[in-house]
């Protein structure tokens, strides 16, 4: 019985890995062994960063809201507490967009939050 080496299967698997490594620097996009290691590491980075992206955006929204709130003489934490007490349910993403794009609407929200805290 002749030995079966699986040439087409091996070639297809290696070709797939090299295709995933497209755009990598140096030998990482040409040599199979190095490309395989880098593709695995890239997958780990992608998995980790999909979770970190959510944290980073939340931090960005909070920083924007805080900067806009302090222009109206109120801190971020007091603003958020005031909005909660006033019964205004708006998430941080939308609040940061309002702070950037519609200054008058944000000022009105700040006034309502201040009134609810008194």
From Swiss-Prot:
Per the record, its GO cellular-component terms are:
ribonucleoprotein complex; ribosome
UniProt lists the gene as rplT
Q: Which SUPFAM superfamilies match?
A: Ribosomal protein L20
Q: What does the record give as the function of this protein?
A: Binds directly to 23S ribosomal RNA and is necessary for the in vitro assembly process of the 50S ribosomal subunit. It is not involved in the protein synthesizing functions of that subunit.
| Family affiliation | Belongs to the bacterial ribosomal protein bL20 family.
One Pfam family, please name it: Ribosomal_L20
An annotated Gene Ontology molecular function: rRNA binding
Question: What's the protein name?
Answer: Large ribosomal subunit protein bL20
Q: Which InterPro entries match?
A: Ribosomal_bL20, RIBOSOMAL_L20_CS, Ribosomal_protein_bL20_C
Q: Which GO terms describe its biological process?
A: ribosomal large subunit assembly; translation
Task: Name the source organism.
Answer: Macrococcus caseolyticus (strain JCSC5402)
**Keyword hit for Lipid metabolism:** no
Q: Which keywords describe this protein according to UniProt? A: Ribonucleoprotein, Ribosomal protein, RNA-binding, rRNA-binding
């Amino acid at each position: 019985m002749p030995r079966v080496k699986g040439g087409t299967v091996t070639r297809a698997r290696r070709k797939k890995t090299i295709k995933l490594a497209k755009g990598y620097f140096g030998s990482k996009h040409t040599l199979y062994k190095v490309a395989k290691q880098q593709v695995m590491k890239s997958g780990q980075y992608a998995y980790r960063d999909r979770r970190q992206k959510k944290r980073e955006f939340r931090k960005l929204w909070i920083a924007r809201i805080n900067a806009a709130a302090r222009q109206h003489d109120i801190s971020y934490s007091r603003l958020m507490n005031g909005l909660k007490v006033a019964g205004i349910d708006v998430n941080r993403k939308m609040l940061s967009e309002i702070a950037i794009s519609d200054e008058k609407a944000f000022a009105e929200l700040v006034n309502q939050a201040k009134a609810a805290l008194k």
